[in-house]
């Protein structure tokens, strides 16, 4: 009901009353009716103003300009599923049966070669120019420490087609033994992982390889401990 309709109803009600109410009792009724009419009109007017200017009503959370309240994760997943990646990628794992050497395999669980990357002569061949993330991890293990320090090295090298030479991209060296095991003491096992990773500009036809100095210490007890891979960025 609008404010104008409520005011009109009150005025019609007042006109319907006798113009003159006899005695004090009639005057009291007129006074009460006038007061009630005033309060009714004032309340209706106040309610109309509050609704009109939005002081009361459904609450809305105000967000910064241009920001939509959405969950971006489902949209991102849908977009990625509609647009399969065509970037070169490779992840190869060590052959646990190749004793005394680090041999990479691509036909194993959790291993892959995709979008042009090849595994040839134990090397990853780059299919196109671009930035690549190159990474590799090896895990060494041994029993006790000899009198001479054990130095473990792990290196990733690149044979570039542009200048036909081999250069080291990443390299690390570690020593798991700080002191030799005393004679007669229990020879405790030790484990030493070496991880290498970095981003490099590569050319089509480049070949990437890994090298270690002491393959006899490689630990193949668990899958996923020794691996090598590249990802085009």
UniProtKB/Swiss-Prot annotation:
CDD domains: TNF (cd00184). Keywords: Cell membrane, Cytokine, Disulfide bond, Glycoprotein, Lipoprotein, Membrane, Myristate, Phosphoprotein, Secreted, Signal-anchor, Transmembrane, Transmembrane helix. Disulfide bonds join 145-177. GO terms for molecular function: cytokine activity; tumor necrosis factor receptor binding. Pfam families: TNF. The modification Phosphoserine is found at residue 2. This is Tumor necrosis factor. It comes from Felis catus (Cat). The chain crosses the membrane at residues 36-56. The gene is TNF. GO terms for biological process: extrinsic apoptotic signaling pathway via death domain receptors; immune response; necroptotic signaling pathway; negative regulation of protein-containing complex disassembly; positive regulation of apoptotic process; positive regulation of canonical NF-kappaB signal transduction; positive regulation of extrinsic apoptotic signaling pathway; positive regulation of JUN kinase activity.
């Amino acid at each position: 009901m609008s404010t104008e309709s409520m005011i009109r109803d009150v005025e019609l009600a007042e006109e319907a009353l006798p113009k003159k109410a006899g005695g004090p009792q009639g005057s009291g009724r007129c006074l009460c009716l006038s007061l009630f009419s005033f309060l009714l009109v004032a309340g209706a007017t106040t309610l109309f103003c509050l609704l009109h200017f939005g002081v009361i009503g459904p609450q809305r959370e105000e967000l910064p300009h241009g920001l939509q309240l959405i969950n971006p994760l489902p949209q991102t997943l849908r977009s990625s599923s509609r647009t399969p990646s065509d970037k070169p990628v490779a992840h190869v794992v060590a052959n646990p049966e190749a004793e005394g050497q680090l041999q990479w395999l691509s036909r194993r669980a959790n291993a892959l070669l995709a979008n042009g990357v090849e595994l040839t002569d134990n090397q990853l061949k780059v299919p196109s120019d671009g930035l690549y993330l190159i990474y590799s991890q090896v895990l060494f293990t041994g029993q006790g420490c000899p009198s001479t320090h054990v130095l473990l090295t792990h290196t990733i090298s690149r044979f570039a087609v542009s200048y036909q030479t081999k250069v080291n991209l990443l390299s690390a060296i570690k020593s798991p033994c700080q002191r030799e095991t005393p004679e007669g003491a229990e020879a405790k096992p030790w484990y030493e992982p070496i991880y290498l990773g970095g981003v490099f500009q590569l050319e089509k036809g480049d070949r990437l390889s890994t090298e270690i100095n002491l393959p006899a210490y490689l630990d193949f007890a668990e899958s996923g401990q020794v691996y090598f891979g590249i990802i085009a960025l």
